[in-house]
């Protein structure tokens, strides 16, 4: 730290998830250094914790190639301006929170100026575009990783990495209250319950909803009392799902939910979901699951060649085996999905073993991530 100056931390967050992480980190650092100064690109939560925003986070929150190209000049201007201002400020540590396409280059620029840099949240370099690890190694003094297999990957390339656990694992209880979740959703305690989560993106909902609904129809033949809950992320996805349901399964009774994905998982005996963060959340909710995923044929062909992992879902990557059934592309058919879900809806050995393994994995990644991240920042700042 610079003599006679309070701890000064520069941060850049590019989206809502990064704002949540940044706010938790700032809170943990303020508990140790009450006079610390925080500056950079911040969302409302980070600003509420006292971070001085040189730019609003929304400036960086662009998705899709067309949108990025339309904003490229502005994004490059912001990065160049931040490089200059942070170089003049000489913060004790710079923390780039996610947003790797923006932050890793910025981290490299600052590291060349002698500023300590941290990249918080590993990009999926272990899964695809693995050569990015070399740029990350040149650009950062430390990567903070949510998952243990991410640290193992960086260790192979001698890139400093600290496994800090996952903030979602900290936020969710080890033993969720299933009956309370059912009460809040109006689901009888003694009914069988299935959650359908066909994804958050329009393309996913379009590709998966029909087969997910047909799967529920098949399962209801075995379990006539089956309650089906379908949480959707926003009004647009709900409207899209309702249109597909009207064409495919107009008579299937379901509970459509606005948001409430976590409650639906906790309340359910089993879930059928697209992969992604939802699979991790479902594991932490202790809800046995099957992953079903389909994409356009060329995209799948390309993904098979680019992706370097044996599994697509985080529970399987954490377990190092096929704990959760993954039915991808041509295998993602209603009968196959139903066959995989049947033993999970039955109150038997398969379901209980999966539940117990989920609990063990939860404990592995429940490490108080905010405090661990603050430890890493303080160690670099010395």
Curated annotation (Swiss-Prot):
Signal peptide start-end: none
Pathway as given in its UniProt record: Glycolipid biosynthesis; lipid IV(A) biosynthesis; lipid IV(A) from (3R)-3-hydroxytetradecanoyl-[acyl-carrier-protein] and UDP-N-acetyl-alpha-D-glucosamine: step 5/6
CDD domains: Glycosyltransferase_GTB-type (cd01635)
Listed Gene3D superfamilies: Glycogen Phosphorylase B
Sample GO molecular function, one term: lipid-A-disaccharide synthase activity
Biological role stated in the UniProt entry: Condensation of UDP-2,3-diacylglucosamine and 2,3-diacylglucosamine-1-phosphate to form lipid A disaccharide, a precursor of lipid A, a phosphorylated glycolipid that anchors the lipopolysaccharide to the outer membrane of the cell.
Descriptive protein name: Lipid-A-disaccharide synthase
Taxonomic lineage from the root: Bacteria, Pseudomonadati, Pseudomonadota, Gammaproteobacteria, Enterobacterales
Name of the gene: lpxB
